[in-house]
């Protein structure tokens, strides 16, 4: 043991030196100090289960050596996390203490983070009316904040820390050594409180935090496994903790009970706690406070007490420690599964803040970094808070009439971004004044820092000090994420080419979804032509791109198309001095766009010491010398002229006066001309000096249109001009703005669409827009709100129009103005006195703008061995997806004009064939990226370049599908096939050589379970359609299951699916999915497992839950074989399973790989605790729930019940989570005592089945048993079902349905209700307990007016035989359907009838023209039969029947044997009889029927007669058919089948058909 520490650092609090700080004091000081100075007979050390093993035993050892014999040390551990900090845990600890006879002299040692300190302090404050305690904080957060000051508390449902006491600890022992083992996220979490303290108290400390961020994060993130990973920042750490602790101690000593000054320590907490109350426990306290600080600083800015630069500085400092600054932070979205924080709920949470005075909310407002507005929290009205918290803002008209204001816009975005690049590339230090503090410039700062181009620091709050590295940049392995910052993307693409290789040889630039649509092709072409390697990683001509670290451009002559963006030109100009020889830059392709911005770049380069010469002969040619930028001592960024158009436009539109004091005629920016060239012609008075611009608008409503204005020199300002033109008298035509289509959005279209919401009509021009103005009093109310496309200029432009709109205007994306003017709404409120209100986004707003379409529209490439079934799979796919199928072998032959054998036999040979094949693949990938299906030749994977193309395609969202079936079958088939070139080597060897190539290139695999030539191959089999629906994203199974009150998956416990095919259809009855327990299979070979999935999908016909359960989680798979586990997970994903069970105990890299590759498979993130180490009563499960919430679409937690009460604890746990998150949760207990939890689980409960060899888990029940139990406890209501009609006394329907209800554990009853009057059942079908009804003659038509809706089939047939009550909450909709035709189709298919194809049309026939005939016609049409002959006595009825169906049904009458003979080429192969069997057949009809049955053409093939009558069971017509050698189906089959379908529609359960059949037949 180390020497005891004799003199650690101490801090005085409340007059005593009770805060003790140093390294190593836990084991070398604390025990001795306690025993000497805080004496007791009983010490209790309380910590959490994570810390216990590491820190408690060594302390016990030290303590026991030093303690007298009559002194005892007790220890207790609780689960970690905020969930434990509640009434239940407090009571548990107190009961335990009482059971150990703890008395008033007890001293409690709270070892842990804020949760332990807060709660154990409260236990100490209340146990026996108060016992002594000491704090031993182990987290940075607790060291600098929660352990100091005596605030103790627990959380309650209304919020954090609402029940507690002030109870000062006797000592606070801060051992900095604890921080060595603190997880990275927890350390960063604590930095939020450190930043908070500096922000309110000490700017010097804040500056130190800014400067040390990189060093601190590097140390904290160090992979160094030694005990002292934080050694490099040992002194910094002590300074940070000492500094924060001293501030807190000083404040607490002045204001122990939080009368005023101590409020200041709550900066960031008023809003932060509200976020935390909603997002806990997934978001940590410091993370919530970090977002809260930004929001509260924005609030101070809105109220006019804090400068925008201070907000930006605070936000940047927080972000530099990897803390979130908004709810949109990707980590927050992932941690909380995108949980929303409604503003009303936040305000409700804030209403119970302890600082408040009654209903007045109090918030700490900053006035500068290191200083607060008042020495206490300030009262702030709800309206202001709501604006800052809301995603949208409503603008009310009403600028004061005589307003005359001076507004200074933020620094120019264009100049700011150029200045950052030039300063970073320059040598020396420069101070940049008035830099724009915005999202875009932040992106640029972060990127330049990432490339090690420069170091940055801040002076006086808003002066940026840049120390450039003279162009010495390093490539980075972390992609530069640029969001939607277009300027940054263009400038940095060239800058990335200046980088030197580091541990990587290239840099990736990427951005958000919109950025990936914006063009960058012309710039990339110019760089490539100059020797820089640039690769597109997704879409051609857009980000993401990978730029080689070329160490600079080659130089010489460069050509660039500059008609789309002047930023391409500026990008190359700024990088050119670092080329290996001087650059001549020629702009080609027409007149360059936005010439003033090119001039701006050249003028700024001169300020940084590089002179660009413009050619006298060709003004579009520039000469750039080699050189290094020399940074000026200071550089002042002009205000943004584009942004200045908005305040000036408000003056113009409202008839008031506004001055922009620092933009005039000598501005570098083209948009400075806006006032002179746009506002003056519109009727404004404009005064412009060299450096300032003043605009006074004409009387409101009198702006004049400008017939034509060319805005090419100031394209960004066209949006401002457009909203003014909207209320000007006449039509305004704006041209020269073509580049605005490829900005943050298509701005021209955006203007047109959003102005239309005001009733203003616009016409798009080739390079502009025409706006037809209307009087402002006639502006319509844009009720859905104005969608801003995440475009700052759209938002600000429409805020201008809103200032005179007769209706308040909702602008949907308030925060997007942060890109160039973060304080724009503050400016509107404080300068223009515009009334604003914050609002949530309305639910309807999504209708008016794009949302991603469900499903994957990308083209599909099918690969696989010749003979594996690619062509067949392609045909199925084409039919299911309704996409064209192109066989690339056939397409190659078509393009080449030769067959493949001919190409191979020619001089081109195999090499020439493979080259042509590769070129074709490249062509179709490029030119047919969506909506197609391509079947590739088997050998395409032999070419490495083709493999790379296919692999790249699959990795970028495309589908490459490997089709395979039993290898022996493939080989046998190829031995027979003589139609294609023979293999020159053994077929099996070819397959095994290609197999790894197939697997490498494909991201999905279909293993066909269908033997060659099986009947299923004539149409897409069910298993293939199901597979396709998953991989293409069309399956909505999870959404459907979520709507059910009770759903199940049955756990299959068989070692080989092929040996259980006979029981699987029975086993899956009543379940919504079937679980394949991969860990229980006899072989873990991925190919064997893929075959098991295929066989199961084919046999079960329901979605698959794919599970690899490890030994420690209650399964059989080895715990530590992570490599094989990942292979098996990938096998499941490639097989397109609907659900994959992913254990949260797997290593993070396995979890990340599976979640990244999941496609449209839903992840069930699971944790099982078969050894019962966790309890539902405390927070033990929360860490697993939090992790599952991040990675799963469904969360599954399975514990063990030792007694019935454990199920009630589980129920309470589930209820608390359900209130916080809507992610589906499976949570239950194993064991006999846990059966109740299975009954009550509700969502996808795992079940067994009596036919299975074993249960997958102890205590598992069948679905039928659970339904029986639910009925017994009143959770499953008994419902009444009926048959309506007359006569019905002999019906077999009650026998059918009551048998199926009984077999499936349902408490329902089916009975007869005999009537021939529909009115008799009107009340019955609306009764609460009505479950559904069958309808027969004579009510099939009469019942329809009593229903709310009718299925399409029932409409066509004109009859309803089934009533289904569709329940949606309390609302019940009665839906009518017809299952007669479904029963007919099923009976025919069961008899072997297959669907007709367009290639081989077949006729069908219906006998009779009564009510059932229509269903028979529809059934035959559904099976593809055409023409459909009808044989009946009354030709007029047949004619009327034919006319009532759509023409494509092709219904024809047959009335004589001669007509039968005349139709010799289209004789029916299927006949459905709908005539009664208890009367003789009409003679004329009999002759026609016999002629058809005995026609010579029917000697070949399958011929089936379906008899609809079932009394008698064997009818005369059946005898006629059998005499002619036709197969016959008795009427009871259809009765059974239509009833079987009715049962499915009512219950959602698909029983075994033979069970329904047996009930009908009376077996």
Curated annotation (Swiss-Prot):
One of its GO terms (biological process) is amino acid biosynthetic process. It is found in: Cytoplasm. One of its GO terms (molecular function) is 3-dehydroquinate synthase activity. Homodimer. Residues 857-1051 are annotated as: Shikimate kinase. Pathway: Metabolic intermediate biosynthesis; chorismate biosynthesis; chorismate from D-erythrose 4-phosphate and phosphoenolpyruvate: step 2/7; Metabolic intermediate biosynthesis; chorismate biosynthesis; chorismate from D-erythrose 4-phosphate and phosphoenolpyruvate: step 3/7; Metabolic intermediate biosynthesis; chorismate biosynthesis; chorismate from D-erythrose 4-phosphate and phosphoenolpyruvate: step 4/7; Metabolic intermediate biosynthesis; chorismate biosynthesis; chorismate from D-erythrose 4-phosphate and phosphoenolpyruvate: step 5/7. It catalyses: 7-phospho-2-dehydro-3-deoxy-D-arabino-heptonate = 3-dehydroquinate + phosphate; 3-dehydroquinate = 3-dehydroshikimate + H2O; shikimate + NADP(+) = 3-dehydroshikimate + NADPH + H(+); shikimate + ATP = 3-phosphoshikimate + ADP + H(+). Residues 395-834 are annotated as: EPSP synthase. InterPro entries: 3-dehydroquinate_DH_AS (IPR018508), Aldolase_TIM (IPR013785), Aminoacid_DH-like_N_sf (IPR046346), DHQ_synth_AroB (IPR016037), DHQS/DOIS_N (IPR030960), DHQS_C (IPR056179), DHquinase_I (IPR001381), Enolpyruvate_Tfrase_dom (IPR001986). Keywords: Amino-acid biosynthesis, Aromatic amino acid biosynthesis, ATP-binding, Cytoplasm, Kinase, Lyase, Metal-binding, Multifunctional enzyme, NADP, Nucleotide-binding, Oxidoreductase, Transferase, Zinc. The lineage of its organism: Eukaryota, Fungi, Dikarya, Ascomycota, Pezizomycotina. Binds 2 Zn(2+) ions per subunit. Its cofactor is Zn(2+). The active site is at 258 (proton acceptor), 273 (proton acceptor), 816 (for epsp synthase activity), 1168 (proton acceptor), 1196 (schiff-base intermediate with substrate). In the N-terminal section; belongs to the sugar phosphate cyclases superfamily. Dehydroquinate synthase family. In the 2nd section; belongs to the EPSP synthase family. Pfam families: DHQ_synthase, DHQS_C, DHquinase_I, EPSP_synthase, Shikimate_DH, Shikimate_dh_N, SKI. Its EC number is 4.2.3.4, 2.5.1.19, 2.7.1.71, 4.2.1.10. This is Pentafunctional AROM polypeptide. Zn(2+) binds at residues 193, 269, 285. ATP binds at residues 864-871.
